[in-house]
Amino acid sequence: MITLRPLLLLVAFISFSGCATNLHSSASATTPTATYQPGELNGETLFDILSAELAANQDHYDYTLKKYLKQAELTRDPNLAKRAASIAQYLRDTQALSKAVKLWIIADPSEPEPRQILANILITQGKFTEALPHFKTALDQGQGKALLLITSQLGKMSDTEVTSYIELLEAVDIDASLNNDRLVSLGILQRHLKQYDLALQNFNRALKSSADLPNALYQKAETLKSLNRYTEALSTVQLLLADAADDRQYNALEIQLLFLLKKNKQGIAKIDLLITKNENDVPLQNYLALTALDFNQLDKSKSILEKLLRSSPINSSPYFYLGIIAERNDQPLQAIENYLQVDSGSNLLQAHPRAISLHKKSADKKKVENITEQLIASHKENQTTYLLMLADWLNKFEFRQDAISLLDKNIQLQDENPALLYTRAMYLEPVDSPAAERDFKRVLALTPENAVALNAYGYTLTVHTNRYQEALTLIERALTLPPKAPATIDSMGWVLYKLKRYEEAIRYLSQAYLLYDDPEVASHLIAALAGNNDLERARQLFIKISNSPPDNKFVEQARQSLESK
């Protein structure tokens, strides 16, 4: 293997010497014609590195990266690969960085740093299975940074992927200096899978080795909380607070535990103390208000939220939570007023529908229409959401024709709005299935991969026509797309029942019922069981759903399925 470190030093010297010659574009540069000889320091390598460093001296880093990647690949020199990786990191070019570190690993398999970098890249990209061998090699070579990264990505990992990392961490022969980090990471992964007892064992093993590991203590406290061992959890977090009294994470956990232990006065006192110490910290005060709300400490939550509104009237977000408090206090008019005062932020489209939903009488129709009109005028960007909100309210209170007329009017203005078309189709389906079918077709012309519309159209065909094979094709397509909702699985079972493919129907309908034990799904499963002459299971399921309201039409349909046998 050639060693280019002296050449890199020479190039660095030339770069810092302030060469005044401007770098020509790559198109105008003339590359030496010498034939490249792998493993030798030849003219092409020298020319590329010199031109790359001169380019870097003039901030042309893309050119520099291109040349270093080329020569790293040709020479298999680890120093060139490392330089390419460094430039790619500076440019935040993940694709180039992946290529550079892979070349670096090939050039120097014993070097741990590129393994660490590659593991980090793959983990960040969510390629957890692909990252696993590099993660292991990095640990074997004493690189522990990936432990922190993998625990930070748990929300993106499947249970199978988490299990693979648990098995690796249980088996890996790791440097003693990293063992406590391994145990804590292992415990965090196990806690994610709700393996609380195993997680607790690993946190305790780490603490036995070093009694003052903050992360191990904190994770232990959280695990004890998950096991409902609140007193032990409180004692553990208070050990942390003895050395870090102002740590927000520790204080937040202590407050939760105080409320869980019904020590409400102490919890409120702790909230007051934190607010006094952090009078200008709006995010902290907002968090404390929501914590109080979570534990139904409504008066305390309300007082903090009202204080936040006084200090910053322009921020309307607290009104959303004041609306929730008013609802819990059985004050619907106050709740409506609060919800409607939310005029921006992430809760806007939760607040306004909640305000509408609190109008619980058909006599409120004019009021609801006026509110919706005002909301559309104030928030034109959310017009579709508000129209659907109003249509849903009208349909719920048996103003179906008014809901359809509302959608007709707005579809004339927005004839390519799939949400309006889909909603009208759903309202038309019970009363005018051909019109509903036309709308479903328009929705699918606009959004061909719309799994919800594919399912709804397919199910409509099973209910109103005998075009079962066409319905099956639509529902099969829906099942290949996300989300694989229980409703789609139910539709698949139902169309198979219509096709008299009873055993297949039972498999799908049983799966749907496990996911969503609704009387409609149950009635479909009972029909399929009866069709397959499995009357005992059908009767047992009917007994289970017969406690539904006596006028439930699906219970009656299930009864008819049994009586027909």
Where are these regions (language model features)?
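C-terminal motif of bacterial Sec signal peptides marking the signal peptidase cleavage site
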Residues: S17-G18
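Flanking scaffold residues of small Cys/His-coordinated metal-binding clusters
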Residues: V11
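Bacterial N-terminal signal peptides that target proteins for export
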Residues: M1-L8
